């Protein structure tokens, strides 16, 4: 049974729109959430994913605001996070409402001028659902800076970015309030899914509101004001900003947006989201924001606001000095050609036309747009590591295969397609015997369902597992195919 604090009920009763009832709100909060996932189109199309999963008993109900998002139902009660297709990065387990902010930011107009969306910031990224959704919307083009303040959550963010094959991300670990100072007017678009009171999450956490207090709401709203101001300062003139929370009170939502408008006046232009998707008007406020109450779409509660920065605004602090000792250098023409030839000739992968960088004996792939950020801020991780160079030649890195071996593969690529049982064995770190012995082929890409799992060494009679030890799984769930009754 959901625990609703009486102080919360008293406060929210005054803010609930007239066309909604408190009884319906409480009833919605007591219902379990519908399961929802987002297909990772960096690796597989939604149609192909449905074709893959429907024989396993999955049914798909489209989420109206996300083209690749679905409410799903299936017979199994196992943890989906252990499913082979999830480990492989074919889908992300993501609550439907949390798909709204990237959709609001990347409206169709965002794609009409490609130059408009070269540098995007996700100010509070972990665990990575919205970051990887934006990476898919950007099709791994341009630069996506993903920031997370919590050190432990940065590790989770990095793991999800790699699993989903997002190759154009640069990860940072800072308090989001410093971005306006360090990266002033540097981004074409900014998403800030702000830390909040979490009032909208009560359907998955029955105790989320047990200790609710107005003092806590007031305190966190001050942090949110500082974050949205920092995000606004980091936004280029003409750029778009989306502010979102998974909470319901006005102080953390409309109040934060109104604060920004009070400080920066006409430089802040609110954009209506009433036409974002069919039925959006049911949750649209007078300002054009989306205030999603749980009973409207049978989802988590959520708030989404979009604004345009119409003019440059003064920076609050002097520009910081450039940082020195950046550990990467641009690869020479000879080095760049060497690594390109290795990927093309040995692996059948055409490297994207991006920056090839070198650090010691490591080769990395950076987005071209990252050049403008060198020395301006410390980054935890940039792009993807392609390979190590040793006296025996190049040794490809797992993350490069996961990110690049999908749509970049040539017909001559050395791949081995495996069954679901063999894929499970591979992900558990085991070698895979080959049914028919043949000539050893050296390094090969192991694939399941048309998407890569990683590398192996073809020894003629078996595939020697080259999966990094830290990625070996103790449990991999194979979702069984459903038999149709006559």
Curated annotation (Swiss-Prot):
S-adenosyl-L-methionine binds at residues 124-130, 148, 175, 193. The active site is at residue 246. GO terms for cellular component: cytoplasm. Specifically methylates the cytosine at position 1407 (m5C1407) of 16S rRNA. GO terms for biological process: rRNA base methylation. SUPFAM superfamilies: S-adenosyl-L-methionine-dependent methyltransferases. This is Ribosomal RNA small subunit methyltransferase F. It holds the Pfam family Methyltranf_PUA. CDD domains: AdoMet_MTases (cd02440). Keywords: Cytoplasm, Methyltransferase, RNA-binding, rRNA processing, S-adenosyl-L-methionine, Transferase.
């Amino acid at each position: 049974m959901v625990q609703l604090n009486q102080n919360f009920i008293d406060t929210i009763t005054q803010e609930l729109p007239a066309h909604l009832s408190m009884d319906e709100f409480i009833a919605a909060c007591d219902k379990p959430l519908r399961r929802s996932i987002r297909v990772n189109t960096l690796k597989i199309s939604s149609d192909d994913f449905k074709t893959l999963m429907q024989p396993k008993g999955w049914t798909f109900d489209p989420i109206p605001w996300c083209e690749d998002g679905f409410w799903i139902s299936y017979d199994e009660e196992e943890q989906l996070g252990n499913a082979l297709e999830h480990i492989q990065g074919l889908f992300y387990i993501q609550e439907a409402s949390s798909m709204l902010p990237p959709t609001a930011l990347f409206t169709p107009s965002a794609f009409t001028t490609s130059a408009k969306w070269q540098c995007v910031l996700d100010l509070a990224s972990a665990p990575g659902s919205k970051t990887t959704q934006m990476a898919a919307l950007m099709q791994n083009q341009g630069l996506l800076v993903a920031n997370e303040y919590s050190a432990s959550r940065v590790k989770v963010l990095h793991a999800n970015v790699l699993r989903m094959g997002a190759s154009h991300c640069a990860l940072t670990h800072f308090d989001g309030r410093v971005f306006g100072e360090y990266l002033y007017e540097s981004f074409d678009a900014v998403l800030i899914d702000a830390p909040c009171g979490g009032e909208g999450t009560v359907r998955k956490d029955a105790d989320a509101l047990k200790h609710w207090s107005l003092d806590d709401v007031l305190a966190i709203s001050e942090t949110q004001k500082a974050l949205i101001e920092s995000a606004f300062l980091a936004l280029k003139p003409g750029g778009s900003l989306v502010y979102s929370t998974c909470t319901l009170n006005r102080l953390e939502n409309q109040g934060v947006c109104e604060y920004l408008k009070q400080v920066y006046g006409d430089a802040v232009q609110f954009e209506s989201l009433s036409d974002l998707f069919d039925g959006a008007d049911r949750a649209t406020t007078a300002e054009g924001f989306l205030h999603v109450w749980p009973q409207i779409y049978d989802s988590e509660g959520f708030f989404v606001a979009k604004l345009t920065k119409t003019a440059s605004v003064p920076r609050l602090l002097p520009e910081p000095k450039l940082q020195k000792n950046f550990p990467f250098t641009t690869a020479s023409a000879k080095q760049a050609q060497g690594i390109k030839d290795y990927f093309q000739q040995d692996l059948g992968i055409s490297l994207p036309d991006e920056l090839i960088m070198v650090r010691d004996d490591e080769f990395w792939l950076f987005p071209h747009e990252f050049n403008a950020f060198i020395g301006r801020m410390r980054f935890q991780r940039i792009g993807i590591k392609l390979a190590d160079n040793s006296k025996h030649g190049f040794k490809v890195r797992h993350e490069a295969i996961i990110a690049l071996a999908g749509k970049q593969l040539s017909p001559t690529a050395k791949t081995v397609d495996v069954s679901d049982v063999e894929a499970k064995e591979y992900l558990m770190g085991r070698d895979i015997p080959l049914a028919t012995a043949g000539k050893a082929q050296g390094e090969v890409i192991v694939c399941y369902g048309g998407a890569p799992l990683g590398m192996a060494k073809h020894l003629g009679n078996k595939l020697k597992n080259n999966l990094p030890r830290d990625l070996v799984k103790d449990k991999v769930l194979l979702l069984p195919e459903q038999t149709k009754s006559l």
